[in-house]
Regions:
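Membrane-embedded alpha-helical bundles of multi-pass transporters/translocases
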Residues: 2-261
């Protein structure tokens, strides 16, 4: 039986709820990850007093690990079969660990410098993995929400707008909230703010889970195996060029960031 539902068969109320729910997923991602992008390097170097070069190397290593986990999570989503669909469960079960990982990244204990660096490695790798867990499904779920190309464009627009809104909220309020809540103690302030944004992010991910529906599922299409996926990447010249470009981009970014600290 064909599970696809045309936009005309769905109520306007459902369409708007689904658009909002889909957008809230990226709102949550950016509300949490934007703090990481903007302030984690500063937190590690100026608040926790870790070496900028050590942190730059750590970020580079994590980017390499990310390249692997992105493929693995995508493969796992493709193999997921639940009554909620393939992608939706990842929002439900990934939300809290992602928020907790972000909180832990800003909760470096007062131990030796080597211990702090080891803690930073462990928490940042965990955080990056959990970001992959909740972010990759935002891309994989879109084709299953509708088979109407115009509606997919509308959904993508809602996603980008709410992602921008989440990033803007962080850029406009985070440092002020850190000063207010920490009362001069930046370490405490970052923990409190990350906890606040993490809670809001969790609620948004849960709303994404409850408001969207995977209807356009095609179970009869043969999925590639993990080995086939990896082999295809090795033969994909544009992908290899893109990967090298991304590596140089991140290297330049972190070298520049290190020089500014």
């Amino acid at each position: 039986m064909d599970q696809r539902k045309s936009v005309g068969m769905l109520s306007k109320g459902f369409l708007y709820r689904q658009r909002l729910g889909y957008g809230l997923g990226d709102f949550a991602c950016n509300l949490i990850w934007q703090i990481i992008s903007l302030y984690l390097l500063y937190f590690y170097t100026d608040v926790v007093h870790l070496g900028a070069k050590s942190i730059a190397v750590m970020f580079m290593i994590c980017r390499v690990i990310d390249a692997i986990t992105d493929v693995l999570v995508g493969f796992a989503i493709d193999k997921t079969k639940t009554r909620w669909g393939k992608s939706r469960p990842w929002f439900l079960f990934g939300a809290v660990p992602f928020a907790v990982a972000a909180f832990l990244a800003f909760s470096v204990p007062d131990i030796s410098p080597d211990g702090k660096l080891l803690y930073a490695y462990a928490t940042y790798i965990f955080l990056s993995f959990m970001y992959t867990v909740v972010n990759i499904p935002l891309a994989s779920i879109l084709p299953t929400l509708t088979d109407d190309m115009n509606e997919r464009t509308v959904l993508a627009t809602w996603r980008k707008f709410l992602a921008f809104l989440g990033s803007s909220i962080v850029s406009a309020t985070a440092l002020t909230l850190v000063q207010v809540t920490g009362r001069g103690n930046e370490a405490l302030g970052f923990r409190i703010v990350m906890g606040m944004f993490g809670i809001v992010g969790c609620v948004c991910f849960f709303l994404t889970f409850f408001l969207v529906r995977e209807n356009n599922l095609q179970e009869n299409i043969k999925s590639a195996t993990l080995k086939e996926m990896i082999m295809s990447l090795g033969k994909n010249t544009p992908w290899k060029v893109f990967a090298i470009n991304i590596m140089f981009m991140w290297t330049g970014y972190f070298l520049q960031s290190s020089a500014l600290v």
